[in-house]
Structures are given as structure tokens and as C-alpha cells.
Regions:
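Solvent-exposed loop/turn segments at secondary-structure junctions
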Residues: 45-48, 77, 84-90, 113-118, ...
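Catalytic His-Asp segment of secreted/periplasmic serine-dependent ester chemistry enzymes
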Residues: 174-269
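Serine-esterase "nucleophile elbow" of acetyl-processing enzymes
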Residues: 32-83, 98
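Secretory targeting and sorting signals
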Residues: 1-31
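Structural recognition of the beta-strand scaffold that forms the well-ordered cores
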Residues: 38-43, 47-49, 78-83, 105-110, ...
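Acidic/histidine-rich helix-loop elements
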Residues: 50-62, 122-131, 244
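Oxyanion-hole/transition-state-stabilizing segment in secreted/luminal serine hydrolases
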Residues: 91-144
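Short amphipathic alpha-helices and their capping/turn segments at secondary-structure boundaries
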Residues: 24-38, 92-109, 113, 151-166, ...
Length: 269
């Protein structure tokens, strides 16, 4: 276990002990006779918990991350918290695969958004004109369709090889906007919908490749409905926040709920 994992588990334990209901907190004790599920968390900023400081290190790892929140549930024991803000598929392969081995029972993986430079697209649409937004969306759509699948295939194959006994959960990305609440900065409702469509396309490609490798895909789209950056109760941070267009505390709680409700304990060895 890495030092960062130990520190995060200690910090998170105090918070979770106050928040979990008695019945839920007692569950691990009843399962004490079974071996713990060795869990390694890989990915980008959506996996590291970026957006909710304080951060443990330059990777933007936060105790708000869904990986830390699910630590201790369903016999899950967070072993290596390797997810790092800014990670691409190439970066993950270069720096995060060492977290995995034959003892790994569960892997969560959030990757792909930085490969298509999704943050740049959103930035263009909310701060520039219609032409800049349309051009950015068109360009990134081509990357999603024609470039990203190959990168994901390579990444997933190497994850599977590095953790041959693990159940791998791939998490998707939320729609960032709630167009029904009107314009957001320079982005009209129509442009917001176009970006949401782009997020849907990204998720569909990630899900398709994940399923081809026998991985489980967890879609968070429905959980974030009506909680876009321009909604009355946003679960995502807006442009003025340093963690712009990443989940807030509520958003990461939604991720944790999505993962724990989707994973069958029988799949965890």
C-alpha cells in the first residue's frame, strides 16, 4: 500500500464513521471472515477527486474521491490510489499500471476525457463565440470516433494483463450542463445540448470498448440530470472555480453511489 493510500484512508475513516448509519457500519464486521477485496483506483481527475481540496499531492487526490468513499464498503480495501489529475491513456500506462498485480481484486478506471481535450472544448464554448464552439465540437467528435477507441483498447488490454484476477469497473463522465435553465456564460442552451451530446458520444465509445474487454461500465448520466453547472443545485463546479467542470462534494458522492450500487459483491473475489 502506498503512503498516500494510508493517509487518505486514515483521514476518510474519521469522516465516514460519522456519516454511515449503524447498520451499514456493522456490515464489514459480519464479513470479517472473508478476505478483503484489494482495490486499486486508476484514472484522471474525475478519479482523483480533483475539485474538492485540500489535495494530498500534485495529482489532485482528495478524500472526496469516490475511491476513498467506497473504501471499506463490500469488504473493499483501497490499496493503491493512483488516479491523477491530467492523466491521459498514455500517462496512465506510464505511471499507474504499477499499482496493479495478481492480488488486485477490484479496479476502477476513469480515463479518456483528457485524450480528447474535452476541457478545451468546454472552455471554447463557454468563453468564445459560436464558430469557435462549433469548430471545437466538430474536431473533438472526430477524435472520439476515430482516435480514442484505439487508445482505450490498448489501455484496457494492459490493465487486464496487469490485474488478471480483477473485476474492472470503468466510470463514465456526466453531462456538464442543464440547458433547460438557460444560457451559461457564452454557451447558449443549444450549445450546451451539443456539449451534452458530445459527452454522451464519449460515454458510448468508452462503454463499447470496456464491454469488449469484459469490463463493467458505470454510467453516471442519470444521476447528474438537473445538476449541471447552471442548475439551481449544481453537482459540478463552474468556470470561476479552480476545479472548474469537475464534480463538487455532491457530485463525487453521486459517483460513489453509482459504483457501489452497480457492483455485485459476488463479482469481488
Amino acid at each position: 500500500m502506498t503512503t498516500s493510500s494510508r493517509i487518505l484512508r486514515t483521514a476518510a475513516a474519521a469522516v465516514l464513521a460519522l456519516c454511515l448509519p449503524v447498520g451499514f457500519a456493522a456490515a464489514p464486521a459480519m464479513a470479517a471472515k472473508r478476505a478483503p477485496v484489494v482495490y486499486d483506483a486508476l484514472g484522471d481527475s474525475y478519479g482523483s477527486g480533483y475539485g474538492v481540496p485540500p489535495y494530498l499531492d500534485a495529482c489532485g487526490r482528495s478524500t472526496a474521491a469516490y475511491a476513498v468513499q467506497i473504501d471499506g464498503r463490500m469488504r473493499i480495501e483501497l490499496d493503491d490510489f493512483a488516479a491523477c489529475a491530467g492523466a491521459t491513456t498514455a500517462g496512465l500506462l506510464a505511471t499507474q499500471l504499477t499499482a496493479l498485480d495478481a492480488t488486485t481484486s477490484l479496479v476502477t478506471l476513469s480515463i479518456g476525457g483528457n485524450d480528447i481535450r474535452w476541457g478545451d472544448v468546454v472552455g471554447a464554448c463557454v468563453t468564445q463565440g459560436d464558430l469557435a464552439c462549433a469548430g471545437a465540437l466538430q474536431a473533438t467528435t472526430g477524435v472520439i470516433r476515430n482516435v480514442l477507441p484505439g487508445r482505450l483498447h490498448s489501455t484496457y488490454a494492459q490493465v487486464a494483463a496487469a490485474a488478471p484476477n480483477a473485476h474492472v469497473v470503468v466510470t463514465g463522465y456526466p453531462r456538464l450542463f442543464s440547458p433547460e435553465y438557460g444560457s451559461y456564460l457564452a454557451a447558449s442552451p443549444a450549445e450546451q445540448q451539443a456539449m451534452n451530446d458530445g459527452a454522451d458520444l464519449l460515454n458510448s465509445v468508452i462503454a463499447d470498448v470496456a464491454h469488449q474487454h469484459g469490463f463493467q461500465f458505470v454510467d453516471v448520466t442519470r444521476r447528474f440530470l438537473d445538476h449541471g453547472v447552471n442548475a439551481p443545485e449544481p453537482w459540478l463546479l463552474g468556470l470561476s472555480d479552480p476545479g472548474r467542470f469537475h464534480p463538487n462534494v455532491d457530485g463525487y458522492e453521486a459517483y460513489a453511489a453509482a459504483v457501489t450500487s452497480s457492483v455485485n459483491p459476488r463479482d469481488l473475489r
